A protein has these predicted regions:
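Catalytic phosphate/metal-binding cores of nucleic-acid and nucleotide-processing enzymes, i.e., regions
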Residues: 1-113
């Protein structure tokens, strides 16, 4: 991959998919260029939200949350989350997750099913 930023993003997506698989979720990285953007990580379980993965030095939380809301609709999911790499932390288990409060409550209450 010639673009270092794309390579960085792809590596972060693979790391998240691998971590979710280790945790017992069937997760796969969605190839770039799909006609309908459903997010970066696909988990067949409909109760799981759409997932957007970010590895950027500059945060754009509002923009990312807006984007993942569109991806959630495209994926047929009620909600979406953004997983973003934490500086200095290679293990996705310690990365951040961003979503709206409404999304958080929906996930906690299990209404995403």
């Amino acid at each position: 991959m010639s673009n270092p930023n794309k390579a960085k993003g792809s590596a972060a997506e693979r790391a998240v998919a691998d971590y979710l698989n280790v945790r017992g979720l069937e997760a796969e990285r969605v190839p770039a260029g799909a006609s309908l953007d459903r997010g970066d990580i696909w988990v067949p379980d409909k109760s799981f939200p759409a997932v957007q993965v970010k590895n950027h030095a500059r945060l754009d939380l509002a923009g990312w949350v807006d984007d993942v809301a569109i991806q959630a609709k495209n994926a047929g999911r009620e909600t979406g989350i953004v997983i973003h790499k934490r500086r200095g932390k290679g293990n996705p288990a310690s990365w951040y997750v961003t979503c709206t409060l409404d999304t958080l409550i929906t996930l906690i209450e299990g209404k995403n099913r």
